């Protein structure tokens, strides 16, 4: 999964200089990417093969079926990860950033002009991001659970310890989040490097003994498997797909590590290690089909079982950490794009801006993840839910990619339709197989996606109605300034800043202040923060202001969906351009809206209540914009929607 999961090393554009220094930097970035980007897909060998032969729709571990499953798995990794994501979708970046929301913002901002088309694509992208949140709840649960299940292989008496151990590990992981991962993050890459080395080593030992397993790279083994097993074979695709879960993370983390390090790490190290392990599991099953209930741990010598269970547990925790950080990132993006209310965000690193902590998201994720462990009870039962979330996300990525290639890249229709049709057939096959498990857990990520989509859509629509109501009760800036010339109010010395959602409209707080106090400050600045559909706005383009008449100034501050508006930074940039407002002497005026339901509006009553609840629990503008609380005056406004 994950959209824009942040690692410990800070952002890079992936540009690596030539020479020895460049190669050293490339190696360092690639090692860092191992710990953040590839943790999810790298822990799939714990359960992917097992679910094909031992899951809800597990098939008999005959030689033909083993070769067929491995063939399907091999080509899934090649077509979905290597071809679709690394070759094509990673080209569709939004100023270097990847992920569903970044991709949606790119399409909407640059290519789609019709309002109806924009709404449809925004809804598709928003639902994809919502399903990703459901996946983020499942991934830590299934990953850590699949690792700790090795305890019962060490000794059956440990079986009762699996669930408690998993809950303790997950609870510790979430409770640690507020400390950040700056120090521990340096260990992520080397640990995952060791994990992949062990994967490859365990696999190659078995392949040497049964080299005939390599015949599975031939696609006709997979085709024959589907033809011979028909419906049963199709249903097994849902388990085969588990091998490519985490592919979305390669695209989502592109802005952090760059295309080249991710591609090289995949081709030269990750893909070979995964294939060696999967084929090694297949080779072992050729000789011992009865091991289908635990093929991964069956590869491990008895003397190495305890260290391997510990390493697997640490690897799954690292993979979970990357996804948790990804949830913080997608929450941040949704807030900046106006789909979620303001939430508390803490920066956990003074040197790396991408390292953030969102308490509300953390506690919700913790409750859901531990609830899934307790509710499902095993990684095998969670597998159905996991596959459903990822197939939905990948299908949506294909749809969005189509519009990028058609409208931005102007691809010729024959080439475009041929490629997208290939991706769509693969995606729909896996999606259909995963949906067959709808009542076995696949409903969960879809339910979470629908809930989050409803919340985000409700907030966006509610804010739109709220702004419309406020604009109907105020004046344009030009009209207001003209009215001052007719009836000049008393002016008092000082500087005042009013925050406004629309730079051309007078803030309601200003009108209420003037109506009740009958005075205006001698210098008044109307500050508007504009969220752009790009990841970041350079400082040179972040702030601009216009001097109006009668001591008024209009200030517009632009920031990207990966940035946070900060009043001190904006004032510094504006003062450098000649604004001359003293931060310590400014009075900041804000309006605080009280939402009241109005039967005349078309929005459903339940959604009105939902919006009002979200508005009441949103972080205050004072905290969100970093305003000095001792200089803030809030004016209450009642608004009907």
UniProtKB/Swiss-Prot annotation:
It comes from the Bacteria. Keywords: Cell inner membrane, Cell membrane, Ion transport, Membrane, Potassium, Potassium transport, Symport, Transmembrane, Transmembrane helix, Transport. It is found in: Cell inner membrane. One of its GO terms (cellular component) is plasma membrane. It is a multi-pass membrane protein. InterPro entries: K+_transporter, K_trans_C, K_trans_N, Kup. It catalyses: K(+)(in) + H(+)(in) = K(+)(out) + H(+)(out). The chain crosses the membrane at residues 29-49, 66-86, 119-139, 156-176, 185-205, 231-251, 266-286, 298-318, 356-376, 384-404, 415-435, 438-458. The keyword Ion transport applies. GO terms for molecular function: potassium ion transmembrane transporter activity; symporter activity. Belongs to the HAK/KUP transporter (TC 2.A.72) family. Transport of potassium into the cell. Likely operates as a K(+):H(+) symporter. This is Probable potassium transport system protein Kup.
């Amino acid at each position: 999964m994950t959209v824009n999961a942040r690692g410990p090393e800070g952002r890079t554009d992936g540009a690596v200089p030539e020479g020895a220094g460049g190669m050293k930097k490339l190696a360092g970035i690639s090692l860092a990417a191992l710990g953040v980007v590839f943790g999810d897909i790298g822990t799939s060998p714990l359960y992917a093969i097992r679910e094909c032969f031992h899951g809800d729709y597990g098939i008999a571990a005959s030689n033909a079926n083993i070769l067929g499953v491995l063939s399907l798995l091999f080509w899934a990794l090649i077509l979905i990860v290597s071809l679709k994501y690394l070759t094509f979708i990673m080209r569709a970046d939004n100023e270097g950033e990847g992920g569903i929301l970044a991709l949606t913002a790119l399409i909407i901002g640059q290519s789609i002009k019709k309002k109806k088309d924009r709404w449809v694509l925004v809804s598709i992208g928003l639902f994809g991001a919502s399903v990703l949140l459901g996946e983020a709840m499942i991934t830590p649960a299934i990953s850590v659970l699949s690792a700790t299940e090795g305890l019962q292989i060490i000794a059956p008496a440990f079986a009762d310890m699996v669930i408690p151990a998993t809950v303790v590990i997950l609870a510790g992981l979430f409770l640690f989040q507020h400390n950040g991962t700056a120090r521990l993050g340096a260990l992520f890459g080397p640990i995952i490097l060791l994990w992949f080395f062990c994967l490859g080593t365990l696999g190659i030992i078995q392949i040497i003994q049964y080299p005939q397993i390599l015949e599975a790279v031939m696609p006709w083994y997979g085709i024959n498997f589907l033809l011979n097993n028909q419906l049963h074979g199709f249903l097994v695709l849902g388990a085969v797909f588990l091998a490519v879960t985490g592919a979305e993370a390669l695209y989502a983390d592109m802005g952090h590590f760059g295309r080249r390090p991710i591609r090289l790490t995949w081709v030269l190290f990750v893909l070979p290690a995964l294939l060696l392990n999967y084929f090694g599991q297949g080779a072992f099953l050729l000789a011992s089909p009865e091991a289908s209930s635990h093929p991964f741990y069956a590869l491990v010598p008895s003397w190495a079982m305890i260290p391997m269970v510990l390493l697997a547990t640490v690897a799954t925790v690292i993979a979970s950490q990357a996804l948790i950080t990804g949830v913080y990132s997608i929450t941040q993006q949704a807030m900046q794009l106006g789909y979620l209310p303001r939430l508390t965000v803490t920066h956990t690193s003074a040197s790396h801006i991408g390292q953030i902590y969102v308490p509300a998201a953390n506690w919700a994720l913790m409750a859901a993840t531990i609830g899934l462990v307790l509710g499902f009870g095993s990684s095998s039962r969670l597998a159905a839910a996991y596959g459903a979330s990822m197939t939905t996300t990948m299908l949506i990525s294909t749809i969005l990619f189509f519009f990028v290639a058609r409208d931005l890249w102007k691809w010729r229709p024959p080439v475009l339709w041929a490629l997208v049709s290939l991706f769509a057939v693969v995606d729909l096959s896996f999606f259909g197989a995963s949906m067959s498990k709808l009542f076995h857990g696949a409903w969960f990520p879809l339910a979470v996606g629908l809930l989050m989509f409803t919340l985000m859509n409700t907030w966006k629509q509610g804010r739109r109605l709220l702004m419309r109501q406020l604009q109907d009760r105020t004046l344009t800036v030009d009209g207001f300034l003209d009215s001052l010339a007719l009836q000049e109010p008393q002016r008092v010395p000082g500087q005042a800043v009013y925050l406004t959602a629309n730079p051309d409209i007078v803030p309601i707080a200003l009108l209420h202040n003037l109506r009740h106090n009958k005075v205006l400050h001698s210098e008044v600045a109307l500050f508007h923060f504009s969220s752009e559909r790009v990841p970041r706005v350079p400082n040179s383009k972040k702030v601009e202001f216009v001097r109006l008449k009668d001591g008024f100034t209009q200030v517009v501050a632009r920031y990207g969906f990966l940035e946070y508006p900060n009043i001190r930074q904006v004032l510094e940039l504006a003062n450098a351009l000649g604004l001359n407002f003293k931060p310590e002497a400014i009075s900041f005026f804000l309006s605080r809206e009280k939402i009241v339901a109005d039967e005349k509006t078309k929005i459903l009553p339940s959604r009105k209540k939902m919006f009002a609840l979200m508005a009441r629990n949103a972080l205050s503008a004072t905290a969100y914009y970093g305003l000095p609380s001792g200089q803030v005056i809030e004016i209450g406004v009642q608004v009907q929607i």
